[in-house]
């Protein structure tokens, strides 16, 4: 599928979704007019396989960049499902089947991410949150180190964060058919990658960049919670 036809597909998804769901969306800082220099898209608070619903809130200029150069991983179990895997492959020019291990699948994803024009998407918690607030193994929803590796690798452009209010009220893992005509809560934040890296270096020890990124993103997730999450009353590092 070429970029134009994929863009048309994404626009159709957006229009259909907006007839079914209402969106409560906030831009924490100024909403950009275009996303040509956006290199990294981070989804925080991963709760459902129905997160493509968020496309209903994406600006058309963002959809165009996704249609041309988006690269994102999908869990191998999800990727291998005939219908679901096919649908997820329609959303981007390159979709990578990823295992839970640092193996060849991760190396392949990183190789694609290194390409000059790539627009990388990642849900850095790795697993979906269940109704009890934990992952399917009963573990806390912590940020994994892979996102810090990607940030280290990038030397220009912007990072766009989507803070999800959660989709358990629409469809929780294992619950089947999604509920219709609900409100979707989300926030966006965008900032310069190099400024972010410089800030993380300043607030961390020499060899603790990864830990600083993980801590900061977890605080941002908690601070920018919406109705399905509880705020922790903490402040993330301000990016100037």
Label each region the model flagged.
Residues 39-41, 117-123, 158-160:
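Residue-level preference for the first positions of well-ordered beta-strands
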Residues 46-48, 125-128:
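Short glycine-rich anion-binding loops that position phosphate/pyrophosphate groups of nucleotides
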Residues 130, 134-203:
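A cross-family acyltransferase "interaction/gating" segment
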Residues 106-114:
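Short amphipathic alpha-helices and their capping/turn segments at secondary-structure boundaries
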Residues 34-100:
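Catalytic core of membrane glycerolipid acyltransferases/transacylases, capturing the structured
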């Amino acid at each position: 599928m070429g970029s134009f036809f994929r863009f048309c597909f994404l626009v159709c998804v957006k229009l259909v979704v907006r007839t079914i769901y209402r969106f409560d969306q906030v831009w924490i800082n100024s909403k950009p007019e275009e996303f040509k220099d956006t290199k990294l898209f981070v989804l925080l608070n991963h709760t459902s396989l129905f997160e493509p619903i968020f496309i209903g809130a994406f600006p058309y200029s963002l959809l165009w960049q996704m249609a041309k150069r988006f690269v994102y991983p999908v869990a191998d179990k999800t990727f291998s499902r005939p219908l679901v895997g096919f649908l997820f492959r329609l959303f981007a020019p390159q979709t990578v089947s990823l295992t839970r291990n640092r193996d060849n699948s991760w190396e392949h994803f990183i190789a694609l991410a290194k390409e000059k024009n790539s627009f990388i998407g990642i849900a850095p918690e790795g697993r979906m949150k269940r109704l009890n607030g934990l992952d399917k193994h009963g573990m806390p929803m912590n940020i994994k180190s892979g996102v810090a590796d990607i940030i280290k690798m990038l030397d220009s452009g912007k990072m766009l964060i989507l803070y999800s209010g959660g989709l358990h009220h629409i469809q929780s893992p294992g619950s089947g058919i999604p509920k219709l005509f609900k409100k979707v809560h989300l926030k966006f934040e965008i900032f310069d990658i190099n400024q972010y890296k410089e800030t993380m270096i300043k607030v961390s020890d020499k060899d603790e960049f990864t830990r600083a990124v993980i801590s900061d993103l977890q605080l941002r997730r908690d601070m920018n919670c919406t109705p399905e999450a509880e705020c922790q009353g903490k402040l993330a590092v301000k990016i100037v």
